[in-house]
From Swiss-Prot:
NCBIfam families the UniProt entry points to: S20
Taxonomic lineage of the native organism: Bacteria, Pseudomonadati, Pseudomonadota, Betaproteobacteria, Burkholderiales
Job description of the protein: Binds directly to 16S ribosomal RNA.
HAMAP family documented for this protein: Ribosomal_bS20
Protein name: Small ribosomal subunit protein bS20
Region of interest called Disordered, as start-end residue ranges on this chain: 1-20
Organism of origin: Ralstonia nicotianae (strain ATCC BAA-1114 / GMI1000) (Ralstonia solanacearum)
Pfam family, one: Ribosomal_S20p
Domain of life of the organism encoding this protein: Bacteria
GO biological process: translation
PANTHER family per the UniProt record, alphabetical: 30S RIBOSOMAL PROTEIN S20, SMALL RIBOSOMAL SUBUNIT PROTEIN BS20C
Cited Gene3D superfamilies: Ribosomal protein S20
Family: Belongs to the bacterial ribosomal protein bS20 family.
Gene Ontology cellular component list: cytosol; small ribosomal subunit
Length: 88
């Protein structure tokens, strides 16, 4: 239980920050799912277009340190590889 004024304020801030970070993580997962769905659709050009938008979202969230930069890089790498495999 937060006893000091500072601790109470930090507890309030933590609730707000948690909600904001959760929303950003959700946006990241949604972007990855959108690319996966486009890949499953079979249209390489459409998948590449969706991937380009997802890349921006992934990088932005990694820059804010919501997810680790290596996790973001891994996600982009796997999606890119999946798109490249479509042509083969």
């Amino acid at each position: 239980m937060a006893n000091t004024a500072q601790a109470r304020k930090r507890a309030r801030q933590a609730v707000v920050q948690n909600a904001h970070n959760s929303a950003l993580r959700s946006r990241l997962r949604t972007a990855v799912k959108a690319v996966r769905k486009a890949i499953a659709g079979g249209d390489k050009a459409a998948a590449a277009n969706v991937f380009k938008q997802a890349q921006s979202t992934i990088d932005s969230i990694a820059d804010k340190k919501i997810v680790h930069k290596n996790k973001a890089a891994r996600a982009k790498s796997r999606l890119s590889a999946a798109i490249k495999a479509m042509g083969a």
